[in-house]
């Protein structure tokens, strides 16, 4: 009976991690596609030039894919080393997530202040050479989120000149509309808009975060259960 339950657990863990691995492959593929097809779409931050959407997706996809591979192989081969490695990787990821979450809430005001400062410094690079990605990023987010600047539209004045904003700040976008002082503009800053989006979707984001946490804990529990069984018996059990 116990052997049958453990066999079931073994294949459940394999299937669970196979799905995990496939998701990682999908994310990696999307990240590479973004990097190739949207090469000019970069980060908003001059302090972290490599922190683009494509690079983030590639990094997350790689971590998920490697973790899923360790879990799949460790479960199907009943390999103690791989199962332990899988457990440690999940534990490190879980601890890192908790530490980052705690630090974020403890230093939230400082994070907001530094983020706004860094984004405003990035605006100064809007029309400079070799920063087409940053320009495209600002144009897209301002058009999609109906916002202008970091805190408000006046953030653009030191960059583009008095009473001048990018055309994407106009409520009705047209060539040169940002130079017309009478043109209706999106008044809300993009930083505030992003915060509003997170606030509006906090329940969905919280649910997703809880699901990820449960999956990590289940993965750790499954791997340690198999590890302990193999360690006690000192041999593989028949599938």
From Swiss-Prot:
Modification after translation: Glycosylated.
Principal location class: membrane
Stretches in topological domain Extracellular: 35-55, 107-203
Superkingdom field: Eukaryota
Membrane-crossing segments per the record: 14-34, 56-76, 86-106, 204-224
GO CC terms of this entry: focal adhesion; migrasome; plasma membrane; tetraspanin-enriched microdomain
Tissue: Expressed in megakaryocytes and platelets (at protein level).
One Pfam family cited in the UniProt record for this chain: Tetraspanin
Cytoplasmic side: 1-13, 77-85, 225-239
Membrane topology: Multi-pass membrane protein
Compartments where found: Membrane
Record: glycosylation sites: 180
Parts forming coiled coils: none
Keyword line: Glycoprotein, Membrane, Transmembrane, Transmembrane helix
Keyword Cell membrane among UniProt keywords: no
GO biological process terms held by the UniProt record: collagen-activated tyrosine kinase receptor signaling pathway; mitocytosis; neutrophil homeostasis; platelet aggregation; receptor diffusion trapping; regulation of mitochondrial membrane potential
InterPro entries cross-referenced by the UniProt entry: Tetraspanin/Peripherin (IPR018499), Tetraspanin_animals (IPR000301), Tetraspanin_CS (IPR018503), Tetraspanin_EC2_sf (IPR008952)
Family: Belongs to the tetraspanin (TM4SF) family.
Subunit structure: Found in a complex with GP6.
Protein name from the UniProt record: Tetraspanin-9
């Amino acid at each position: 009976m116990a052997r049958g339950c453990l066999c079931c657990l073994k294949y459940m863990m394999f299937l669970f991690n196979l799905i995990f691995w496939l998701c990682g492959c999908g994310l990696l593929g999307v990240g590479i596609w973004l990097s190739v097809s949207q090469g000019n779409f970069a980060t908003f931050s001059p302090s972290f030039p490599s922190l683009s959407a494509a690079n983030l997706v590639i990094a997350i996809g790689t971590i998920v894919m490697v973790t899923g591979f360790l879990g799949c192989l460790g479960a199907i081969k009943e390999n103690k080393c791989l199962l332990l490695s899988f457990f440690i990787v999940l534990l490190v990821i879980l601890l890192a997530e908790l530490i980052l979450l705690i630090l974020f809430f403890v230093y939230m005001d400082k994070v907001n202040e530094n983020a706004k400062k860094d984004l405003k410094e990035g605006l100064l690079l809007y029309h400079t050479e070799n920063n087409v990605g940053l320009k495209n990023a600002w144009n897209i987010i301002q058009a999609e989120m109906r916002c202008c600047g970091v805190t408000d539209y006046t953030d653009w004045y030191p960059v583009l000149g008095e009473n001048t904003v990018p055309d994407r700040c106009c409520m009705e976008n047209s060539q040169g509309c940002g130079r017309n002082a009478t043109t209706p503009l999106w008044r809300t800053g993009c930083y505030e808009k992003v915060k509003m989006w997170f606030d509006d979707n906090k329940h969905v984001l919280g649910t997703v975060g809880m699901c990820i946490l449960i999956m990590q804990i289940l993965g750790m529990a499954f791997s340690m259960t198999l590890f302990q069984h193999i360690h006690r018996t000192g041999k593989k059990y028949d599938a």
